[in-house]
Amino acid sequence: MIQKSFVMMKPDAVQRRLMGKILSRFEEKGLQIVAVKLMQIDEDLAKTHYGEHADKPFFGSLIEYITSSPSLAMVIEGEEAISTIRKLVGATNPLEADLGTIRGDFAMDTGRNIIHASDSPDSAEREINLFFNEDEICDYEIVDNKLIYE
């Protein structure tokens, strides 16, 4: 099933100039970037996005971190995109993430774990709608899809 997922490279990925390397992992897998924007996330958007963590002790530092520098927000589409992206991203704790995953290769600390990816279709829809307007999401076909998908 073709799905859309929300993915965000966090400030540490941007500051460490890892955006190109990370983006290429999704494209090389056969996923399609259908929306992307570099943005400075303000406190209100950060609190809305991470609202499920509002009662956790790390919430304040998470908001401070995510608003500290630009992030790269994306919508990525593909067959079973949500689970595929989660596998590419790796475990939330980079020290538990397998080598070869984005977090396993580029991150060392849970508080600076490089990237966010939607964990369910409901989360993906909510997060996409939070960060993108409908007219910012492109609908196009990649010519090599017939080489990737049967």
Swiss-Prot record:
Its cofactor is Mg(2+). Its EC number is 2.7.4.6. The keyword Transferase applies. Its main location: cytoplasm. Signal peptide: none annotated. GO terms for molecular function: ATP binding; metal ion binding; nucleoside diphosphate kinase activity. Gene3D superfamilies: Nucleoside diphosphate kinase-like domain. This is Nucleoside diphosphate kinase. It comes from Methanobrevibacter smithii (strain ATCC 35061 / DSM 861 / OCM 144 / PS). The lineage of its organism: Archaea, Methanobacteriati, Methanobacteriota, Methanomada group, Methanobacteria. The gene is ndk.
